[in-house]
């Protein structure tokens, strides 16, 4: 049976393969498995678990939120709804309110018809695989006895938790942004109101783009996966920096004054060097995923910074950071984790820390981005194949080995099944774009031939 949870929660087309019934069942199972330890959590010795619930702006978020809230309350959990909010705001609210766990409804950068469910454990941490598996197993079983009378959960709106998150973000900014002109692309998502508000409170001159909160247009030609309009706006508005978020604002990418993209690897490099300069980079180590560009590794090695590598997914980055006591980690895609201030990738926090570095150094972002030189990287998404056999195909293994031999020390190959979409990702880095592109296309053809979709 296909696993319900992917690398970042549950995702699917809302009302097709992510239904209200599933959302209610998942919420009930989560209370049963995560709720018991929280019944006595917090200074008030609560009689029932407390669960924080937030969502992005997608139209389907309303009925899925209603289903989740119903499942939680019917299973005996109190619910604190914070409404439309970034994913990291839910994680922060769980920790700040000493909640038992939290639920975020979002499909991140996916198109509008999709939606998803992310669950945060006590303290605001994403669930480990074994807990997600336990929730899936419980969902497959008949429902147990439900509370009655005064034992059912209560539901209340708690917008103040979002205000506490905004205050927390501003407290993590080391300097004011008074002289910076910033364009922020909110992707019509969860940060549409909050990101411009926080940046203005920090002193920046803000031009908000795709920030109406129109969930029907979430991620449509905007945000971290569609940077063209942001690049144009930065140049047209003579801005210093452009900031892009995705639908749930757990990611941040940037654009410099010339309209050039600054990706997650470059942001990490800038922040790692800044922390190291201040003696605040624990063990002089940064944590990244296997997708990180070789140029990042080269730059960190030259700076005397150790790089720890994990599988794709910011929760794996966080797990490695917590295990090693590290404070900075992230992904090329723009998930950046400042573990002293957050428990998950936080796009707004990342934007503030990046802009703070621009402000405190007085250097343009384009100059700071020279902290690393990216090797040409080509990513090909191969659809319509059996992604479950990526690691077991002899034909594919042979093709990868041959490509790696050709590239030598000047490049690398990575093939992996997506954890959030039905496809296989082929990534190649090389010393020239032409070599990377040719190698990636040849490997993609082998993937199509070796991994035909099951009939």
From Swiss-Prot:
Activated by phosphorylation. It holds the Pfam family PGM_PMM_IV. Its EC number is 5.4.2.10. It comes from the Bacteria. It catalyses: alpha-D-glucosamine 1-phosphate = D-glucosamine 6-phosphate. Its cofactor is Mg(2+). Keywords: Isomerase, Magnesium, Metal-binding, Phosphoprotein. One of its GO terms (molecular function) is phosphomannomutase activity. Belongs to the phosphohexose mutase family. This is Phosphoglucosamine mutase. It comes from Frankia alni (strain DSM 45986 / CECT 9034 / ACN14a).
């Amino acid at each position: 049976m296909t696993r319900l949870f992917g690398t970042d929660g549950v995702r699917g087309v809302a009302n097709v393969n992510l239904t209200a019934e599933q959302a209610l069942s998942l919420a009930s199972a989560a209370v049963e498995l995560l709720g018991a330890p929280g019944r006595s959590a917090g200074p008030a010795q609560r009689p029932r678990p407390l669960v924080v619930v937030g969502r992005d702006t997608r139209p389907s978020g309303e009925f899925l939120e209603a289903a989740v809230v119903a499942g939680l309350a019917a299973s005996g959990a109190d619910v604190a709804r914070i409404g439309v909010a970034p994913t990291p705001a839910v994680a922060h609210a769980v920790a700040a309110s000493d909640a038992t766990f939290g639920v975020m409804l979002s499909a991140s950068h996916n198109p509008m018809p999709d939606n998803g469910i992310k669950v945060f454990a006590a303290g605001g941490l994403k669930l480990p695989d074994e807990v997600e598996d336990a929730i899936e197993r419980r969902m497959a079983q008949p429902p147990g006895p439900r509370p009655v009378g005064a034992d059912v959960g209560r539901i209340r709106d708690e917008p103040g938790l979002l205000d506490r998150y905004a205050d927390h973000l501003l407290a993590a900014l080391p300097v004011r942004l008074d002289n910076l002109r910033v364009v922020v692309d909110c992707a019509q998502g969860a940060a549409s109101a909050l990101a411009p508000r926080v940046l203005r409170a920090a002193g920046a001159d803000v031009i908000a783009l795709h920030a109406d909160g129109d969930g029907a247009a979430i991620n449509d030609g905007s945000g971290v996966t569609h940077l063209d309009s942001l690049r144009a706006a930065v140049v047209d508005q003579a801005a210093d920096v452009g900031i892009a978020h995705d639908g749930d604002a757990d990611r941040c990418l940037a654009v410099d004054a010339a309209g050039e993209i600054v990706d997650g690897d470059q942001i990490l490099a800038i922040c790692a060097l800044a922390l190291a300069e201040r003696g605040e980079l624990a063990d002089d180590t940064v944590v990244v995923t296997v997708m990180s560009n070789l140029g990042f590794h080269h730059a960190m090695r030259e700076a005397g910074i150790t790089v720890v590598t994990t599988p794709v997914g910011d929760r794996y980055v966080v797990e490695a950071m917590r295990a090693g006591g590290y404070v900075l980690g992230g992904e090329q895609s723009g998930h950046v984790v400042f573990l002293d201030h957050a428990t998950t990738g936080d796009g707004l926090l990342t934007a503030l820390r990046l802009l703070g570095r621009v402000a405190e150094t007085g250097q343009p972002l384009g100059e700071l981005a020279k902290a690393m030189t990216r090797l040409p990287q080509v990513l090909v998404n191969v659809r319509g194949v059996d992604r479950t056999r990526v690691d077991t195909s002899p034909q594919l293994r042979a093709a990868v080995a041959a490509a790696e031999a050709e590239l030598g020390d000047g490049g690398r190959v990575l093939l992996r099944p997506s954890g959030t979409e039905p496809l296989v990702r082929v990534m190649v880095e090389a010393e020239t774009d032409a070599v990377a592109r040719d190698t990636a296309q040849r490997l993609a053809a082998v993937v199509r031939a070796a991994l035909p979709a099951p009939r």
